[in-house]
Amino acid sequence: MSFKPKSTIEASILDLWKELDPSAAFIGGLKEYAGRMPLPDFPHLESMTRKIGELSSKSETRSQKRLLASLGANVKLALMGEAQIPPDIAISAFFAHLIKEGMVATHLTSLANETVRALRAYASTGPSRSCPTGIRILTSIRCAGLLEVADMLKKQTRSKQLQSAVQSMVAAVNDYSQKFGVTGFKNSGFDEIVEICSREGCDLGRSSYYADALANLYDYSESPTELEARGMSMLDRELPSFKREVEELASKLGVQTKAEVVAHTISKKKALKASRVVGYIKGLKQHVAKLVSTNIVKINPRYVTRVVETPTYLSGMFPSGGAMFLDFLTKKPFQVFMATTDPRRAPETSPAELLNLLVHEEYGHCLHSSNSAMSFGAKPTLTEMLQSQAGNAVSEGISFHREVEFLNYLNEMKQRKATTSERAFLKFLAKYGGADEIFEEYTFFTHLWRMVRFLRVVGDARINSDKQNLMEFIDWANRETGLSKSMVYHQVFPAHQGNGPGYASTYAILGESVATIQQEALRNGKKLVDFDTYACSLGFPPRSVFEEKLRTYATG
């Protein structure tokens, strides 16, 4: 490990983190944690809660205290009956192993066996009361995902040990789903969810602990009411101009004045063939890297990110693309940026959409991890490199804001004479429809995703506070923005609420925070590229620590 504990307390925190999330330890570079899963039986979870409390009382820094608060809050969610957590951990562990090392039968066999043990432990010691319908839906979705993983493993391996372990895992998943999921769940999409909610309701049952989760799981300072108000303020600020933008593009394209119709029309007209997507991204990043490093955020000289086509067996988990940080606790960190081309997932692969994906995933998430792991523009502690839900929120905020930073740069570039690197970039884009059209479409997609992320804030607050149920919120969002009910559902609920109350808000809330402090730094004479390099090198501290460090930099 390149990051070492500076005290016995920090060493104890590292040990606790490894026990709670062995898969994260493995992908962080600790090979001895391959094939391991945490044990979520209730007596063990309760003992972990006590251990976290004891360590918190001895914590030496705010980073340590808030990390422990986030870890403790996640354990409490499992104790509150959020039954989607064990299968979610298992899915994350499987795709982490598959992305990092491919089909290593011994590790995957161990992981399948550990998954069986984890699911049975939670089922036998967990909540006796029936989970709320919303939690049962989230659990069924994750169980369906695990069954898809199992099906892939059976097809991809010849190992009899792995096949046997997978068969046992399938039985355990089915038993778990029968106890904690929705009876007869088919995982067939939005229409099925509407039917379930109309029949059984869609309550998540989180109103009694939502405020606590905001404060501890994600280190928010806002109350649920304040969070909703912030989301509405963002939406009210930008939705009118976005609607005008949709009208103009729809008129130009000769299609219905709806954002999704515009998006699908662009995609249909300009989507790259699957065989060209990775090549386009690799060519694109050669130019974008130079522009980003010069104008937005510096890239450390040992930055390594591999661009790959999402394997078909992972495309269900990454329907458009994604990023993963690997060996981030070692001296040789690297990242993987995946682009999905599997036609079953109908990925959007127009040049502008792929540019947006590249900016968000690679020059947001991947660069944040790499610059932090290399201590490039700042020196994070070991505690601040241990990923948690609170720390991951920081990465979401950085990546969300990076999209609009790149948009601002493109608009500024159009107002002056292009540099040599910019001319090369424009020449490259000429092969894919030309810079003018791609810039216009990048603007549209960036603004579309901003609307989605603002809606996530409002939805997160209302649904988890029981102010609106899921279907009521979807109906409201459809009327307010014109986005389809299906899109609102998919962008607000299955992945984001499954990650816990508060996660859906992280993109916009943390992104707005970065933007606000950045403006203060610029007013005080700091350069944007220096501010962003510092912010992008701070590791994964909880929000309050991250913001405090940024404000100190901005005013110093």
Model region roles, listed by residue range:
Residues M1-G556:
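N-terminal maturation segment of proteins
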